[in-house]
Amino acid sequence: MIITSLLDTDLYKFTMMQVVLHHFPAANVEYRFRCRTPGVDLVPYIDEIRDEVRGLCSLRFVDVELDYLRRMRFIKSDFVDFLALFHLNEKYISITPSPKGNGEIDIVIEGPWLHTILFEIPVLAIVNEVYFRNTQREPDYREGRERLREKIKLLGAKPEFADCKIADYGTRRRFSKVWHEEVALTLRDGLGPQFAGTSNVLYAMKHDITPLGTMAHEYLQACQALGPRLRDSQIYGFEMWAKEYRGDLGIALSDVYGMDAFLNDFDMYFCKLFDGARHDSGDPFEWGERMLRHYEANRCDPRTKVLVFSDALDIPKVMQLYERFRGRCKLAFGVGTNLTNDLGYVPLQIVIKMVRCNGQPVAKLSDSPGKSMCDDKAYLAYLRQVFGIAQPVEEDASK
Protein backbone atom coordinates (compact mmCIF):
# COMPACT_ATOMS: atom_id res chain seq x y z
CA MET A 1 0.00 0.00 0.00
CA ILE A 2 1.39 3.40 -0.98
CA ILE A 3 -0.19 5.54 1.74
CA THR A 4 0.14 3.92 5.16
CA SER A 5 -0.43 6.95 7.39
CA LEU A 6 -2.88 9.85 7.25
CA LEU A 7 0.04 12.08 8.25
CA ASP A 8 1.59 11.38 4.82
CA THR A 9 0.32 14.71 3.55
CA ASP A 10 1.19 18.40 3.72
CA LEU A 11 0.90 20.38 6.95
CA TYR A 12 -1.32 23.05 5.42
CA LYS A 13 -4.07 20.48 5.01
CA PHE A 14 -4.32 20.25 8.79
CA THR A 15 -4.06 23.99 9.38
CA MET A 16 -6.86 24.59 6.86
CA MET A 17 -8.90 21.66 8.17
CA GLN A 18 -8.86 23.15 11.65
CA VAL A 19 -10.31 26.40 10.27
CA VAL A 20 -12.99 24.38 8.48
CA LEU A 21 -13.91 22.54 11.70
CA HIS A 22 -14.19 25.73 13.72
CA HIS A 23 -15.74 28.09 11.17
CA PHE A 24 -17.14 26.22 8.13
CA PRO A 25 -18.19 22.74 9.34
CA ALA A 26 -21.28 22.65 7.09
CA ALA A 27 -19.53 23.60 3.82
CA ASN A 28 -19.82 21.18 0.90
CA VAL A 29 -17.23 21.17 -1.86
CA GLU A 30 -16.20 19.55 -5.13
CA TYR A 31 -12.64 18.93 -6.33
CA ARG A 32 -11.51 17.75 -9.76
CA PHE A 33 -8.29 16.20 -11.05
CA ARG A 34 -6.34 17.40 -14.06
CA CYS A 35 -3.20 16.10 -15.74
CA ARG A 36 -1.49 18.98 -17.55
CA THR A 37 1.13 16.72 -19.15
CA PRO A 38 -0.01 15.98 -22.74
CA GLY A 39 -0.15 12.45 -24.09
CA VAL A 40 -0.23 10.63 -20.75
CA ASP A 41 -2.54 7.58 -20.67
CA LEU A 42 -3.64 6.92 -17.09
CA VAL A 43 -6.66 4.73 -17.92
CA PRO A 44 -4.75 1.40 -17.69
CA TYR A 45 -3.94 2.18 -14.06
CA ILE A 46 -7.45 3.02 -12.84
CA ASP A 47 -7.96 -0.26 -10.97
CA GLU A 48 -4.62 0.12 -9.19
CA ILE A 49 -5.43 3.70 -8.26
CA ARG A 50 -8.85 2.66 -6.94
CA ASP A 51 -7.29 -0.12 -4.85
CA GLU A 52 -4.81 2.32 -3.34
CA VAL A 53 -7.55 4.84 -2.58
CA ARG A 54 -9.55 2.05 -0.92
CA GLY A 55 -6.54 1.39 1.28
CA LEU A 56 -6.25 5.10 2.04
CA CYS A 57 -9.86 5.12 3.21
CA SER A 58 -9.14 2.28 5.65
CA LEU A 59 -6.61 4.35 7.60
CA ARG A 60 -7.12 5.97 10.99
CA PHE A 61 -4.89 8.27 12.99
CA VAL A 62 -2.98 6.38 15.67
CA ASP A 63 -2.10 7.69 19.11
CA VAL A 64 1.51 8.59 18.33
CA GLU A 65 0.34 10.68 15.35
CA LEU A 66 -2.34 12.44 17.38
CA ASP A 67 0.14 13.17 20.16
CA TYR A 68 2.53 14.69 17.61
CA LEU A 69 -0.19 16.98 16.24
CA ARG A 70 -1.31 17.91 19.74
CA ARG A 71 2.17 19.20 20.55
CA MET A 72 2.04 21.77 17.73
CA ARG A 73 1.45 25.20 19.26
CA PHE A 74 -1.24 26.17 16.75
CA ILE A 75 -3.27 22.93 16.83
CA LYS A 76 -6.24 22.98 19.22
CA SER A 77 -7.12 19.99 21.38
CA ASP A 78 -10.69 19.71 20.08
CA PHE A 79 -9.35 19.38 16.53
CA VAL A 80 -7.10 16.50 17.57
CA ASP A 81 -10.07 14.89 19.32
CA PHE A 82 -12.00 15.15 16.04
CA LEU A 83 -9.10 13.58 14.10
CA ALA A 84 -9.14 10.64 16.53
CA LEU A 85 -12.57 9.78 15.10
CA PHE A 86 -11.77 10.69 11.49
CA HIS A 87 -11.33 8.57 8.39
CA LEU A 88 -11.65 9.27 4.68
CA ASN A 89 -14.84 7.86 3.16
CA GLU A 90 -14.67 6.16 -0.23
CA LYS A 91 -18.19 7.30 -1.11
CA TYR A 92 -16.90 10.85 -1.57
CA ILE A 93 -14.45 10.01 -4.39
CA SER A 94 -14.99 8.59 -7.89
CA ILE A 95 -12.28 7.56 -10.36
CA THR A 96 -13.39 6.88 -13.95
CA PRO A 97 -12.04 7.05 -17.51
CA SER A 98 -12.67 10.42 -19.12
CA PRO A 99 -15.51 10.37 -21.69
CA LYS A 100 -13.07 12.14 -24.02
CA GLY A 101 -11.42 8.77 -24.59
CA ASN A 102 -7.93 10.25 -24.79
CA GLY A 103 -6.29 8.44 -21.89
CA GLU A 104 -7.32 11.01 -19.31
CA ILE A 105 -9.07 10.00 -16.12
CA ASP A 106 -11.69 11.86 -14.12
CA ILE A 107 -11.20 11.99 -10.37
CA VAL A 108 -14.04 13.79 -8.63
CA ILE A 109 -14.09 14.38 -4.88
CA GLU A 110 -17.42 15.67 -3.62
CA GLY A 111 -18.84 15.98 -0.12
CA PRO A 112 -18.46 17.87 3.16
CA TRP A 113 -15.28 19.97 3.09
CA LEU A 114 -14.37 18.73 6.54
CA HIS A 115 -14.49 15.11 5.35
CA THR A 116 -12.87 15.56 1.92
CA ILE A 117 -10.05 18.05 2.52
CA LEU A 118 -7.49 15.33 3.25
CA PHE A 119 -7.99 13.49 -0.07
CA GLU A 120 -6.00 15.75 -2.41
CA ILE A 121 -2.36 15.21 -1.45
CA PRO A 122 -2.38 11.41 -0.92
CA VAL A 123 -4.48 10.85 -4.06
CA LEU A 124 -2.00 12.84 -6.16
CA ALA A 125 0.87 10.89 -4.58
CA ILE A 126 -0.96 7.65 -5.40
CA VAL A 127 -1.51 8.60 -9.06
CA ASN A 128 2.16 9.54 -9.40
CA GLU A 129 3.53 6.41 -7.79
CA VAL A 130 1.18 4.04 -9.62
CA TYR A 131 2.12 5.66 -12.94
CA PHE A 132 5.87 5.55 -12.38
CA ARG A 133 6.00 2.05 -10.92
CA ASN A 134 4.32 0.84 -14.11
CA THR A 135 6.31 2.94 -16.58
CA GLN A 136 9.70 2.80 -14.81
CA ARG A 137 9.90 -0.70 -13.35
CA GLU A 138 13.62 -0.37 -12.58
CA PRO A 139 14.02 3.22 -11.39
CA ASP A 140 17.39 4.87 -11.89
CA TYR A 141 17.93 5.79 -8.25
CA ARG A 142 21.65 6.15 -8.92
CA GLU A 143 20.91 9.04 -11.28
CA GLY A 144 18.49 10.53 -8.76
CA ARG A 145 21.07 10.38 -5.97
CA GLU A 146 23.72 11.96 -8.16
CA ARG A 147 21.39 14.82 -9.10
CA LEU A 148 20.48 15.33 -5.46
CA ARG A 149 24.14 15.41 -4.42
CA GLU A 150 24.85 18.04 -7.06
CA LYS A 151 22.02 20.22 -5.75
CA ILE A 152 23.32 19.96 -2.19
CA LYS A 153 26.84 20.69 -3.38
CA LEU A 154 25.68 23.70 -5.40
CA LEU A 155 23.78 25.26 -2.52
CA GLY A 156 26.49 24.60 0.03
CA ALA A 157 29.52 25.53 -2.08
CA LYS A 158 29.57 29.29 -1.54
CA PRO A 159 29.89 30.85 1.93
CA GLU A 160 27.70 33.78 0.91
CA PHE A 161 24.76 31.35 0.60
CA ALA A 162 25.17 29.94 4.12
CA ASP A 163 21.88 31.55 5.19
CA CYS A 164 19.99 30.40 2.09
CA LYS A 165 17.57 27.72 3.28
CA ILE A 166 15.29 25.44 1.30
CA ALA A 167 12.36 23.26 2.31
CA ASP A 168 10.88 20.11 0.79
CA TYR A 169 7.43 20.81 -0.66
CA GLY A 170 7.33 17.72 -2.87
CA THR A 171 4.74 15.27 -1.49
CA ARG A 172 2.09 15.61 -4.19
CA ARG A 173 4.34 14.99 -7.20
CA ARG A 174 6.96 12.68 -5.73
CA PHE A 175 8.32 9.74 -7.69
CA SER A 176 7.53 7.40 -4.81
CA LYS A 177 7.18 7.56 -1.05
CA VAL A 178 10.42 5.59 -0.56
CA TRP A 179 12.34 8.05 -2.72
CA HIS A 180 10.69 11.03 -1.02
CA GLU A 181 11.80 9.83 2.40
CA GLU A 182 15.35 9.28 1.15
CA VAL A 183 15.40 12.78 -0.34
CA ALA A 184 14.22 14.35 2.92
CA LEU A 185 16.85 12.50 4.95
CA THR A 186 19.60 13.29 2.44
CA LEU A 187 18.71 16.98 2.53
CA ARG A 188 18.62 16.99 6.33
CA ASP A 189 22.01 15.32 6.61
CA GLY A 190 23.64 17.03 3.63
CA LEU A 191 22.45 20.60 4.09
CA GLY A 192 22.28 20.83 7.87
CA PRO A 193 20.96 24.27 8.86
CA GLN A 194 20.32 25.11 5.18
CA PHE A 195 17.46 22.58 5.22
CA ALA A 196 14.54 24.48 6.73
CA GLY A 197 12.09 21.59 6.92
CA THR A 198 9.42 19.67 5.04
CA SER A 199 5.74 20.10 4.27
CA ASN A 200 5.26 16.34 4.85
CA VAL A 201 3.97 15.78 8.37
CA LEU A 202 4.84 12.07 8.50
CA TYR A 203 8.51 12.56 7.68
CA ALA A 204 8.67 15.56 9.98
CA MET A 205 7.43 13.37 12.83
CA LYS A 206 9.57 10.33 12.01
CA HIS A 207 12.85 12.18 11.49
CA ASP A 208 12.57 15.22 13.77
CA ILE A 209 12.32 17.69 10.86
CA THR A 210 10.44 20.98 11.14
CA PRO A 211 6.97 20.73 9.51
CA LEU A 212 6.07 23.73 7.33
CA GLY A 213 2.88 25.12 5.81
CA THR A 214 0.05 27.60 6.27
CA MET A 215 -2.72 27.94 3.66
CA ALA A 216 -3.40 26.75 0.10
CA HIS A 217 -5.50 28.12 -2.75
CA GLU A 218 -8.55 26.04 -1.88
CA TYR A 219 -9.07 27.97 1.35
CA LEU A 220 -9.31 31.37 -0.33
CA GLN A 221 -11.29 29.88 -3.23
CA ALA A 222 -13.90 28.47 -0.85
CA CYS A 223 -14.27 31.91 0.71
CA GLN A 224 -15.79 33.05 -2.61
CA ALA A 225 -18.87 31.04 -1.62
CA LEU A 226 -18.61 31.38 2.17
CA GLY A 227 -17.96 35.10 2.58
CA PRO A 228 -20.56 37.88 2.64
CA ARG A 229 -19.59 39.46 -0.72
CA LEU A 230 -17.53 38.14 -3.61
CA ARG A 231 -15.37 41.26 -3.92
CA ASP A 232 -14.45 40.95 -0.24
CA SER A 233 -13.82 37.19 -0.28
CA GLN A 234 -10.04 37.46 -0.10
CA ILE A 235 -10.25 39.94 2.79
CA TYR A 236 -12.77 37.64 4.49
CA GLY A 237 -10.40 34.69 4.09
CA PHE A 238 -7.50 36.54 5.68
CA GLU A 239 -9.70 37.82 8.51
CA MET A 240 -11.04 34.34 9.32
CA TRP A 241 -7.49 32.98 9.24
CA ALA A 242 -6.39 35.65 11.70
CA LYS A 243 -9.44 34.94 13.86
CA GLU A 244 -8.41 31.29 14.11
CA TYR A 245 -4.65 31.68 14.52
CA ARG A 246 -4.35 35.09 16.20
CA GLY A 247 -1.15 36.04 14.38
CA ASP A 248 0.35 32.55 14.12
CA LEU A 249 0.88 30.87 10.72
CA GLY A 250 1.04 34.32 9.18
CA ILE A 251 1.99 33.69 5.55
CA ALA A 252 -0.64 34.97 3.11
CA LEU A 253 -1.02 33.30 -0.28
CA SER A 254 -0.94 36.01 -2.94
CA ASP A 255 -2.05 34.62 -6.29
CA VAL A 256 -5.63 33.36 -6.02
CA TYR A 257 -6.83 36.53 -7.79
CA GLY A 258 -3.50 37.72 -9.13
CA MET A 259 -1.03 40.16 -7.65
CA ASP A 260 -2.95 43.38 -8.34
CA ALA A 261 -6.05 42.19 -6.47
CA PHE A 262 -3.89 40.85 -3.64
CA LEU A 263 -2.14 44.17 -3.11
CA ASN A 264 -5.46 46.02 -3.18
CA ASP A 265 -6.78 43.80 -0.38
CA PHE A 266 -3.54 43.37 1.59
CA ASP A 267 -3.71 46.75 3.28
CA MET A 268 -1.71 48.19 6.18
CA TYR A 269 -3.67 46.09 8.69
CA PHE A 270 -2.78 42.83 6.96
CA CYS A 271 0.77 43.98 6.21
CA LYS A 272 1.34 44.43 9.93
CA LEU A 273 -0.68 41.41 11.06
CA PHE A 274 0.77 38.77 8.72
CA ASP A 275 4.42 37.69 8.83
CA GLY A 276 4.74 37.69 5.06
CA ALA A 277 3.40 36.39 1.76
CA ARG A 278 3.90 33.40 -0.55
CA HIS A 279 4.60 33.53 -4.29
CA ASP A 280 3.19 30.65 -6.34
CA SER A 281 2.79 31.97 -9.91
CA GLY A 282 4.05 34.70 -12.21
CA ASP A 283 7.49 36.32 -12.33
CA PRO A 284 9.01 35.84 -8.85
CA PHE A 285 11.49 38.70 -9.20
CA GLU A 286 8.81 41.20 -10.17
CA TRP A 287 6.56 39.83 -7.41
CA GLY A 288 9.27 40.26 -4.79
CA GLU A 289 10.04 43.82 -5.80
CA ARG A 290 6.35 44.72 -5.72
CA MET A 291 5.92 43.16 -2.28
CA LEU A 292 8.85 45.11 -0.86
CA ARG A 293 7.52 48.38 -2.29
CA HIS A 294 4.07 47.55 -0.92
CA TYR A 295 5.43 46.99 2.59
CA GLU A 296 7.31 50.28 2.48
CA ALA A 297 4.21 52.11 1.24
CA ASN A 298 2.30 50.65 4.19
CA ARG A 299 4.89 51.75 6.75
CA CYS A 300 6.29 48.25 7.35
CA ASP A 301 10.02 47.54 7.37
CA PRO A 302 10.44 44.83 4.66
CA ARG A 303 13.40 43.43 6.58
CA THR A 304 10.96 42.19 9.23
CA LYS A 305 8.78 40.38 6.68
CA VAL A 306 9.09 36.95 5.03
CA LEU A 307 8.83 36.34 1.29
CA VAL A 308 8.16 32.67 0.56
CA PHE A 309 8.85 31.41 -2.97
CA SER A 310 7.34 28.07 -4.01
CA ASP A 311 6.58 28.13 -7.74
CA ALA A 312 8.47 25.55 -9.85
CA LEU A 313 11.77 26.22 -8.13
CA ASP A 314 15.11 24.54 -8.72
CA ILE A 315 18.36 25.27 -6.88
CA PRO A 316 19.82 27.76 -9.42
CA LYS A 317 16.56 29.75 -9.33
CA VAL A 318 16.57 29.68 -5.53
CA MET A 319 20.10 31.10 -5.55
CA GLN A 320 19.18 33.83 -8.04
CA LEU A 321 16.23 34.88 -5.89
CA TYR A 322 18.38 34.81 -2.76
CA GLU A 323 20.98 37.02 -4.41
CA ARG A 324 18.31 39.53 -5.45
CA PHE A 325 16.49 39.81 -2.12
CA ARG A 326 18.93 38.88 0.65
CA GLY A 327 19.32 41.58 3.27
CA ARG A 328 16.15 43.29 2.05
CA CYS A 329 13.69 40.89 3.70
CA LYS A 330 13.51 37.44 5.28
CA LEU A 331 13.46 34.63 2.72
CA ALA A 332 12.06 31.11 2.49
CA PHE A 333 12.09 28.69 -0.45
CA GLY A 334 9.88 25.64 -0.97
CA VAL A 335 11.13 23.24 -3.64
CA GLY A 336 8.82 20.46 -4.80
CA THR A 337 9.05 18.34 -7.93
CA ASN A 338 12.69 19.25 -8.59
CA LEU A 339 13.64 17.54 -5.33
CA THR A 340 11.26 14.59 -5.09
CA ASN A 341 10.83 13.63 -8.75
CA ASP A 342 14.11 14.32 -10.53
CA LEU A 343 15.47 10.96 -11.62
CA GLY A 344 15.67 11.78 -15.31
CA TYR A 345 12.04 11.04 -16.20
CA VAL A 346 9.42 13.58 -17.24
CA PRO A 347 7.35 14.30 -14.10
CA LEU A 348 3.57 14.41 -14.31
CA GLN A 349 2.03 17.86 -13.99
CA ILE A 350 -1.04 16.81 -12.04
CA VAL A 351 -3.34 18.83 -9.80
CA ILE A 352 -6.55 18.43 -7.84
CA LYS A 353 -8.37 21.74 -7.48
CA MET A 354 -11.57 22.84 -5.79
CA VAL A 355 -14.14 23.82 -8.42
CA ARG A 356 -17.29 24.29 -6.30
CA CYS A 357 -18.26 25.20 -2.77
CA ASN A 358 -21.87 24.97 -1.55
CA GLY A 359 -22.96 24.42 -5.15
CA GLN A 360 -21.34 27.63 -6.39
CA PRO A 361 -18.37 27.71 -8.79
CA VAL A 362 -15.07 28.84 -7.30
CA ALA A 363 -11.87 29.64 -9.15
CA LYS A 364 -8.24 30.65 -8.95
CA LEU A 365 -7.14 33.47 -11.24
CA SER A 366 -3.45 32.72 -11.39
CA ASP A 367 -0.61 35.08 -12.33
CA SER A 368 0.55 32.28 -14.69
CA PRO A 369 -1.57 31.51 -17.80
CA GLY A 370 -2.65 27.87 -17.77
CA LYS A 371 -2.68 27.56 -13.98
CA SER A 372 -6.23 28.83 -13.61
CA MET A 373 -8.80 26.05 -13.30
CA CYS A 374 -12.55 26.56 -13.49
CA ASP A 375 -15.25 24.63 -15.35
CA ASP A 376 -17.67 27.57 -15.50
CA LYS A 377 -16.59 30.16 -18.07
CA ALA A 378 -19.37 32.59 -17.15
CA TYR A 379 -18.32 32.58 -13.51
CA LEU A 380 -14.67 33.00 -14.47
CA ALA A 381 -15.56 36.05 -16.56
CA TYR A 382 -17.68 37.44 -13.71
CA LEU A 383 -14.86 36.90 -11.22
CA ARG A 384 -12.44 38.75 -13.48
CA GLN A 385 -14.90 41.61 -13.80
CA VAL A 386 -15.43 41.85 -10.02
CA PHE A 387 -11.69 41.95 -9.33
CA GLY A 388 -10.87 44.09 -12.37
CA ILE A 389 -8.63 41.50 -14.02
CA ALA A 390 -8.18 41.40 -17.80
CA GLN A 391 -8.86 38.08 -19.50
CA PRO A 392 -5.63 36.65 -20.96
CA VAL A 393 -5.63 35.49 -24.56
CA GLU A 394 -4.75 31.94 -23.45
CA GLU A 395 -8.06 31.61 -21.62
CA ASP A 396 -10.35 33.25 -24.16
CA ALA A 397 -13.75 31.74 -23.44
CA SER A 398 -14.56 31.63 -27.17
CA LYS A 399 -11.87 29.01 -27.79
Curated annotation (Swiss-Prot):
Its EC number is 6.3.4.21. The modification Phosphohistidine is found at H217. One of its GO terms (molecular function) is nicotinate phosphoribosyltransferase activity. Transiently phosphorylated on a His residue during the reaction cycle. Phosphorylation strongly increases the affinity for substrates and increases the rate of nicotinate D-ribonucleotide production. Dephosphorylation regenerates the low-affinity form of the enzyme, leading to product release. GO terms for cellular component: cytosol. The keyword Ligase applies. One of its GO terms (biological process) is NAD biosynthetic process via the salvage pathway. InterPro entries: N/Namide_PRibTrfase, NAPRTase_N, Nic_PRibTrfase, Nic_PRibTrfase-Fam, Nicotinate_pribotase-like_C. Keywords: Ligase, Phosphoprotein, Pyridine nucleotide biosynthesis. It comes from the Bacteria. It is an enzyme of class 6 (ligase). It catalyses: nicotinate + 5-phospho-alpha-D-ribose 1-diphosphate + ATP + H2O = nicotinate beta-D-ribonucleotide + ADP + phosphate + diphosphate. Pathway: Cofactor biosynthesis; NAD(+) biosynthesis; nicotinate D-ribonucleotide from nicotinate: step 1/1. Belongs to the NAPRTase family. This is Nicotinate phosphoribosyltransferase. The lineage of its organism: Bacteria, Pseudomonadati, Pseudomonadota, Betaproteobacteria, Burkholderiales.
